[in-house]
Amino acid sequence: MKFYMTPGSCSTGIHILLEEAGLVFEAHVLNLIKGDHLKPDYLAINPNGTIPTLLRDDGVALTDFVSIATWIAEAFPRRKLLPEEPAPRETAFATMAFCVGHIHGEGFRRIFVPERYGSKGADIDAIKVEGRAIVASALLAIDCELKGNDYAAGGFSIADAALFYNEFWADKIGMVLPPSCLAHYQLMRSRPAVRQVLAEEGYR
């Protein structure tokens, strides 16, 4: 398998899942600033020009966080990256979708690429503030769901990898994580696979 990623991005969550599952893969680092994701050879694999991408051994390219995480969990069930019981399993999927689609998609995108959310001459700072408010509110909602539990859906699952990269971003931009999210973030950072991934990606 070939894994296309950028250190410190949402692909960090997938990187964690690949390591947690003990899978063998070939990592390809894309420099987004240099436009590696827009080069013809990459667009031939992922026409959307986004990361992460996982090119499976059968030639199928998975080109978004949710599809990659779901495939890893379902293709390698012995790794127990999804709960077996219906209720916590649904919680894992719902939490992952909320983290990727709302916290990242609606919140952090406004913080990182505010120019995409307004016409020319728009108040960029106001858009960033709006993004921070979305992230803060969403993390409070997650905090209520965690209620002091170690992980989002019982044991470690794909939901925790999605939540972690958002917590990681919040930490990096100086946002204060609510108590249960902070405990989750610290617990995640203590996991061997997470420590390995952060070290490989140049973070401590």
Predicted regions located by residue number:
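Active-site-flanking alpha-helical
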Residues: 73, 166-167, 198
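GST-like fold's C-terminal all-alpha helical module
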Residues: 99-190
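Positions that flank functional sites
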Residues: 32-33, 185, 203
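Terminal-tail/helix-coil boundary detector
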Residues: 197-204
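Structured helix-beta-strand junction loops
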Residues: 48, 75, 148-149, 191
